[in-house]
């Protein structure tokens, strides 16, 4: 493991672009044919490692393939509930070719090919990567925290996107604890977690602060998955579209490989 010391310039935090710039700093230090990118709240189950390695070997000389697309499980509130509805990205690029023209895009959720590089959110001179699927999932634990720490995270995250002053003003009036809402509206996880997560799961101690059933608190803003629009789209997708999301933005071109 190589740790790179960098300076986070708050002047560059507009719309989360600092995340992409920091990602590119790490990318420049990498060697090898493929680069595997994970954010701090993302984990790969050890059962997928042989699958990922085999897929990289299979596609190594297929230069049209610029990246590999992973499925996602977005856990919410605890380690037993996850999002599988409209509005949460079901796939994302997490392995890319070691190509200097490929850069982290927007606020570092994904990657693009840049003909020339000015900033992560530039409107021209970029195109989507051509990718192939890999039969593996990324487990995203970014929304599994004690409610007080989750609220702190939201404040920090929005400081990067909104600016520190606006975030301070908003969260000074917000509740101290994040309200996950009724977890019964989500899918229940029946699989196993990665071995590296076992200590975190053993120390899970905020069950009594979660709402398992009932209706959302009417005095707070609804989460996206609680809004009628998203619940309706999720119903249509699951019952009439094979679970595939309708009309969502895909930052990639999927190849048949």
Question: Which residues does each predicted region cover?
Answer:
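Short beta-strand-to-loop acidic/aromatic patch adjacent to the donor-nucleotide binding site
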Residues: 32-45
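Active-site-proximal specificity loops/subdomain of glycosyltransferases
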Residues: 1-34
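Catalytic-site signature of metal-activated, phosphate-bearing donor transferases
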Residues: 16-20, 24, 43-257
């Amino acid at each position: 493991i190589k740790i790179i010391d960098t300076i986070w310039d708050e002047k560059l935090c507009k719309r989360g672009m600092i995340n992409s710039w920091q990602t590119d700093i790490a990318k420049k230090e990498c060697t090898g044919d493929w680069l595997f990118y994970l954010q701090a709240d993302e984990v790969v189950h050890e059962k997928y490692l042989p699958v990922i390695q085999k897929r990289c070997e299979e596609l190594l000389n297929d230069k049209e393939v610029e990246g590999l697309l992973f499925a996602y499980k977005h856990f919410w509130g605890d380690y037993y509930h996850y999002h599988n509805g409209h509005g949460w990205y079901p796939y994302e690029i997490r392995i890319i070719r070691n190509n200097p023209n490929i850069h982290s895009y927007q606020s570092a959720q994904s990657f693009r090919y840049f003909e020339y590089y000015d900033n992560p959110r530039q409107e021209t001179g970029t195109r989507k990567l051509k990718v192939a699927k890999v039969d593996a999932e990324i487990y995203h634990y970014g929304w599994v925290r004690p409610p007080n720490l989750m609220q702190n995270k939201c404040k920090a995250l929005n400081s990067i996107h909104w600016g520190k002053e606006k975030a301070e003003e908003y969260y000074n009036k917000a509740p101290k604890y994040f309200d996950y809402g009724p977890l019964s509206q989500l899918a229940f996880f029946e699989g196993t977690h990665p071995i590296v997560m076992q200590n975190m799961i053993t120390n899970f101690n905020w069950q009594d602060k979660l709402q398992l059933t009932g209706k959302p608190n009417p005095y707070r803003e609804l989460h996206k998955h609680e809004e009628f629009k998203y619940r309706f789209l999720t119903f249509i997708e699951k019952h009439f579209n094979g679970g595939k999301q309708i009309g969502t933005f895909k930052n990639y071109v999927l190849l048949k490989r």
